[in-house]
Curated annotation (Swiss-Prot):
UniProt cross-references to SUPFAM superfamilies, sorted A to Z: Actin-like ATPase domain (SSF53067)
GO cellular component: actin cortical patch; actin cytoskeleton; Arp2/3 protein complex; plasma membrane
Organism listed in the record: Saccharomyces cerevisiae (strain ATCC 204508 / S288c) (Baker's yeast)
Protein's UniProt name: Actin-related protein 3
Domain of life: Eukaryota
Subcellular localization(s) per the UniProt record: Cytoplasm, Cytoskeleton, Actin patch
């Protein structure tokens, strides 16, 4: 029963990125795209390695990781001998995941797909392969020696949980499994913020990744499902918006990769879009240039960066500038979400609005959200006071930004999975064999508060 002493494995599979690691660590050991490249039917028996990512591999998320890719064999897609992936035969599997999948798909032998769309698994066969490579090749561990904490989006269908259980207990033979709602884990991660004085599992989580933005109210660790709202604006939409602006200007490089780099390195949220336009018009130094080099560094392209620096993340607050399909600003959606909750929990939901995910990392994102949301709340209170003739005590609106924000869900899972009681809340292989996959429809809540 060595699994009782081994750290739990924490896996956060998002639409855009997957984060892998062990409980108790401050950051995931591996972060790479949730992508898989599978061999085309006519290329299932490749001999020359054409299209294989021989030079580029998934990289560890921190220096000195023992699972670095230095032993990667580009011709086979596996690790060299004398390791778990060799033991399990993953070096013979004709597919790649993560960054290696992106490279392999550039050749004629492989096709690229993303098994998760808008937070939900769409292709379970590809997802199982993705997990298999994640466990044996990157984490280099035996599932029967570890408990696993996996994350899920809000309102995930129970049938999806059962599918996960079947894969992890039957295909991987894992010791135990816990499936946690991402919003609850994000709340736990926010405890690292200096603004948080009470380790509460009550709050409103704004989780914005690559594919979708969720606004999720949580009361004492339980998600208020009827009030959840989804916003069809996230990181990928911002990248595409930047790309469209670059194309309109006829820039030298308008690739998605360049747009993504500009988003990550140059974009910020401004307090007033009209004033920001005026600042740029008066001060040319606010414009920037981005240099794009090819892989051999023999060609250079210069891309001018202008208004998209503040226009791109502005679509959260003025979505009409990018699309006519969705017109409700994020602060309004947050207010509507909280107002749809029971009145006795609203104060706590306004007072603890937690940001999670890479698309909330723009400079001054939290400050702008707090200002706009506070304005909405104050206007409602003023109108209520006018109609009732009474004086309100007001509502404290607080948006929490913290240093673990980018990997908040994974870090929250790491915090909770390292507790002494975690394994007691997991469902084990024995439970699965006795009760079947429906046992994972419910998990007991952590007594963390």
């Amino acid at each position: 029963m060595s699994y009782l002493n081994n750290p739990a494995v924490v896996m956060d599979n998002g639409t855009g990125l997957t984060k892998l690691g062990f409980a108790g660590n401050d950051s995931p050991s591996w972060v790479f795209p949730t992508a898989i490249a599978t061999a085309a039917p006519s290329n299932t028996k490749k001999s020359s390695g054409v299209g294989a990512p021989s030079a580029v591999s998934n990289e560890a998320s921190y220096f000195g990781n023992s699972t670095s890719a230095t032993n990667f064999n580009g011709a086979t897609g596996g690790l060299l001998s004398n390791n778990l992936s060799g033991k399990r035969g993953t070096e013979d599997l004709d597919f790649y995941i993560g960054n290696e999948a992106l490279v392999a798909s550039q050749g004629p032998s492989y096709s690229l797909s993303y098994p998760i769309r808008h937070g939900q698994v769409e292709n379970w066969d590809h997802m199982e392969r993705f997990w298999e490579n994640s466990i044996f090749k990157y984490l280099r561990t035996e599932p029967e020696d570890h408990f696993f904490l996996l994350t899920e989006p809000p309102l995930n269908p129970p049938e999806n949980r059962e599918q996960v259980a079947e894969i992890f207990f039957e295909s991987f033979n894992c010791a135990g499994l816990y499936i946690a709602v991402q919003a609850v884990l994000a709340l736990a991660a926010s405890w690292t913020s200096s603004k948080v004085t009470d380790r509460s599992l009550t709050g409103t989580v704004i989780d914005s990744g690559d594919g979708v933005t969720h606004v999720i109210p949580v009361a004492e660790g339980y998600v208020i499902g009827s009030a959840i709202k989804n916003i069809p604006i996230a990181g990928r939409d911002i990248t595409l918006f930047i790309q469209s602006l670059l194309r309109e200007r006829g820039e030298a490089d308008t690739s998605l990769r360049t747009a993504e780099k500009i988003k990550q390195e140059y974009c910020y949220v401004c307090p007033d879009i009209v004033k920001e336009f005026n600042k740029f018009d008066k001060d040319p130094s606010k414009f920037a240039q981005f240099v794009v080099e090819n892989q051999e560094k023999t060609r250079r392209k210069v891309v001018d960066i202008g208004y998209e620096r503040f226009l791109a993340p502005e679509i959260f607050f003025n979505p009409e500038i990018a699309s006519s399909d969705f017109l409700t600003p994020l602060p309004t959606v947050v207010d509507q979400t909280i107002q749809a909750c029971p009145i006795d929990v609203r104060k706590g939901l306004y007072n603890n609005i937690v940001l999670s995910g890479g698309s909330t990392m723009f400079k001054d994102f939290g400050r702008r959200l707090q200002r706009d949301l506070k304005s909405i709340v104050n206007n409602r209170i003023a109108q209520s006071e006018l109609l009732s003739g009474t004086k309100s005590t007001g509502v404290d609106v607080s948006v929490i930004s913290h240093r673990k924000q980018r990997n908040a869900v994974w870090f929250g899972g790491s915090l909770l999975a390292q507790t002494a009681e975690f394994k007691g809340y997991c469902h084990t292989k024995k439970d699965y064999e006795e009760y079947g996959p429906e046992i994972v429809r419910n998990f007991s809540l952590f007594n963390m508060v």
